[in-house]
């Protein structure tokens, strides 16, 4: 079975637009000032407005971006406008449409929160600034690609310095330790738990990101050969590679919450089901999620996090600058600030956001390292050592293919 990835769909979209629109002459070229040192970029950025397109579905993330905007205005004279997205793919499509229409400068998006499938689509369609700009940021020196390879490899796609790392994420499971003292720690054990406890487990409905990530987690644990998952889906026998996943789901679905006839819309909805005692296990893609929910009174303080014995999916999310950004200098300054120890420390604080840092502690000054070491971890947050066993994300093309097949098989209530 063959699937069209987002990259292929965008190619088709571009062809359609190019056929329909006579390419105009490029807009008046933006005078880009990067210079031999970053001070030149900072000076050129003053007075610019950065239209930062980023998911807007979480108040604590929105508040963090607002804080960053205040700091950037005070320090650099940069205005940061948060354009709140429901789907990053829509922003990618807009950039592609601008390219097809000949808008090679003065684009509507200056900075984009991105990773995985969307980054791969932008890279394939030449929608990114491509001068390895991220590696030239002053704050890049605080990272270590040997310790965290995912900053150079986004869902198996080399980043080539075309996006700047912003934060880390890892799939975690949560359980109420009073109701479920010993949670299942593998796909096989989870299948047995579901069989023995009908109605006590579910997962967010794909295409929710956490729901799709759960499907990938089960596939990685059950597949007889995971190597094809790290190559484009079109190069593989999709039916054969994914058969263990569909077998697992077929066995489990009738014993899910509501008999597998309905699913929580997203992971916050699943978290609420856990808090209300309707299910015994939650899922999130932020190790600090449960602790933050306990602090907000959304979960009881008996909830704890865990991962599977063989590890769980982990990835890095990034900031990218489109090829036609209207304020490329200011976008680089914003990306550098977001990567700085100060901004990363605030972002990692579970009372603020709780998004794990991409910085390498051994690369930091002692006072900055001490700040990270002093962060409250939260009673439900696993330590770095407990999170050390991870699974690499499959090639991004698998995400849509798996989601489409899930919808065909189970999207109408199993």
Regions found by a protein language model. Give the residues of each.
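Bacterial N-terminal signal peptides
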Residues: 14-26
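Extracytoplasmic ligand-binding site segments that recognize negatively charged/polar headgroups
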Residues: 55-67, 82-92, 105, 109-268
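A ligand-binding cleft/hinge motif common to bilobed small-molecule-binding domains
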Residues: 119-121, 282-300
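Bacterial N-terminal signal peptides that target proteins for export
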Residues: 2-17
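Mature extracytoplasmic/periplasmic domains
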Residues: 312, 317-386
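Conserved C-terminal helix/tail region of periplasmic/extracytoplasmic solute-binding proteins
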Residues: 34-36, 272, 379-414
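Periplasmic-binding protein-like
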Residues: 155-156, 169, 248-253, 263, ...
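Short, polar/charged alpha-helical segment
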Residues: 37-46, 53, 57-79, 173
